[in-house]
Regions:
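A conserved non-catalytic segment of reverse transcriptases
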Residues: 68, 142-207, 211-213
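Non-catalytic, peripheral interaction segments enriched in hydrophobic/basic residues
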Residues: 204-233
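A structural signal for alpha-helical segments
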Residues: 6, 85, 125, 200-203, ...
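Exposed alpha-helical structural elements
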Residues: 13, 17, 45, 58, ...
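Short amphipathic alpha-helical interaction patches enriched in hydrophobic/aromatic residues
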Residues: 124, 193, 197, 216-223
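Conserved polymerase palm-domain catalytic core
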Residues: 1-161
Length: 233
């Protein structure tokens, strides 16, 4: 049920799985926001999980060095004792290794869930169940992985009140482009076509085509209305 940064898996697969859960009658979602996830990864816990699969001490030392790489702030390097370097090539892989514990726990509890990197949604059949699951999973993450759930950004609500990977999922199991995703794309189009940029017409068209192709390719899985209709006006 994990789709982020894994071979032959993608956001479209995560959306398809989520839609299947909703169609089965689980129209309430536990939408968890892990507070500053990449900044708060506990190095010792992560290294203990990695050591379960890797015995090469030199490689383990190299990974630890990667985690401890200092951060440059105001010209000074500060030591890092937790978190992973955002944008680093290993960070997505390491996040999956750490959150595999969460996957196993949710499987053990027989929950219907979809995870994409640190974005995890759990689907249940009632509001009461959603509230109970949010509290219990937050407790698990805090006690076992030293990760904090941001309760002000997390929610136990109807699926159509939240967005997941840029989509809004509806209670009938269909998906549409979320309002925020549409708004961001329109803003990008306005920026590209802004006259004050002083770019040649051909360059503007080339940049606009590139942005449009990428957006439509990602949101081609939307059920209705079509992504093109979203952009009318």
């Amino acid at each position: 049920n994990s789709y982020g940064f894994r071979p032959k898996r993608s956001a479209s697969g995560a959306i398809t799985k989520a839609k299947a859960f909703i169609k089965s009658g689980k129209s309430w979602v536990v939408d968890m926001d892990l507070e500053a996830f990449f900044d708060n990864v506990n190095h010792d816990i992560l290294m203990s999980r990695i050591a379960q699969s890797i015995s090469d001490k030199k490689l383990l030392k190299l990974i630890r060095s990667f985690l401890n790489a200092g951060m440059m702030q105001n010209g000074l390097v500060s030591k890092r004792d937790q978190g992973t370097p955002q944008g680093g090539p290993l960070s997505p892989l390491l996040s999956n290794i750490l959150l595999h514990d969460l996957d196993r726990e949710l499987h053990y509890r027989a929950h219907s869930f979809v995870r994409y990197a640190d974005d995890c949604n759990i689907y249940v059949s009632s509001k009461v169940a959603a509230q109970r699951v949010l509290a219990s999973v937050a407790k698990f993450l805090s006690s076992k992985l030293k990760l904090k759930v941001n309760l002000t950004k997390s929610a136990a609500s109807s699926v159509q009140e939240r967005k997941f990977l840029g989509f809004t999922l509806l209670t009938d199991g269909s998906a549409t482009v979320s309002k925020s995703s549409l708004s961001r794309f329109k803003d990008k189009v306005r920026l590209i076509t802004k006259r004050s940029r002083g770019m040649k017409f051909e360059s503007i068209i080339r940049e606009l085509n590139q942005a449009t192709r990428g957006w439509f390719h990602y949101f081609k899985w939307a059920d209705f209305p079509s992504p093109m209709k979203h952009l009318d006006g």
